Every structure is written in C-alpha cells, then in structure tokens.
Design a protein with these regions (language model features):
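C-terminal and inter-domain tail/linker signature
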Residues: 2-144
Length: 144
C-alpha cells in the first residue's frame, strides 16, 4: 500500500514538474519570436537534439540533418542572413505522447506561407525537430 502511495505521489509531482509537450513547443516559439535566443537555446533545446531539414544540401542553406546543440545553433543562426523579418507563428498543434506537430505561419520579407514542424520533447526540451517548409517560397524570398 505504501509503495502505491509513493508511486502516486511521484506521478503527481512529475506532472507538476514537466510541462505539457504542447506548452514546451509553444514556449519555444514564444522565445524564438521574442528574440530571446539565449533562453531558447539554453532551456528549450536539448544538448543531443537532431534537427532534420529535408532538401538537397548546398541548394538550401538549412538543408541537412543537424545533430547536437552546437550544429542546431549554427544552422538556426543562418536564418537572419537569408531572410529579413523572419517569423514563425503556430496556428495549431496536435500531440500524442511526447510528439507534437505544429502548423505554422511562416513570414519574412517576400514570404507568407505555411510550414509544418514536428517535435519530440524530452525533459521539457526539443530532442527531435523535423521541418517541413514551403522551400520554394522560402528560397524565392531568400537574400541572395
């Protein structure tokens, strides 16, 4: 009986400590949108993140599989080089377990489109991110 009470208490405490996965993803978008990249990279991005941006490497500046926080930061940092006034605003999210899919409005100078972003959240951090962007519209809006 005591063991069940301890397990129940642990489950309650775990729920209070861990944010809902959609809240974690929303917080990431909020931090990114406000420009608080220090908190975004420091608190939301897992050290062992894998970010997959489909596309042919060399043709799109973000294309590839980027493993680890340093590679994630290096590649995310390219965004202002190529797109002025880049913003992503979630329109809807669905989740199952630790997985979240966000339908996102993507805007920049010369760009107004929709993206899809897939996340796997671990310990209130992005562990996996896969980006499904309108690469043609984004490419056409790039500073070249």
């Amino acid at each position: 009986m005591f063991l069940k009470q301890v397990q129940h208490l642990a489950a309650i405490l775990n729920q209070e400590v861990n944010m809902d996965v959609k809240e974690v993803v929303q917080r990431g978008y909020d931090l990114f949108g406000s420009g608080d990249m220090e908190t975004f990279f420091g608190e939301i991005v897992h050290d062992d993140i894998t970010w997959t941006f489909p596309g042919e490497e060399g043709k799109h500046p973000l294309a590839g599989v980027h493993k680890g926080k340093e590679n994630f930061i290096a590649n995310m940092s390219k965004i202002p080089e190529y797109w002025d006034n880049f913003m992503v605003t979630p329109q809807a999210m669905i989740s199952e377990g630790n997985k979240v899919f966000a339908l996102v409005k993507g805007t920049a100078d010369g760009m107004d489109t929709m993206f899809g972003h897939y996340f796997e959240v671990e310990n209130n951090q992005f562990k996996v991110m896969m980006t499904f962007d309108d690469t043609l519209t984004a490419f056409n809006a790039m500073k070249k």
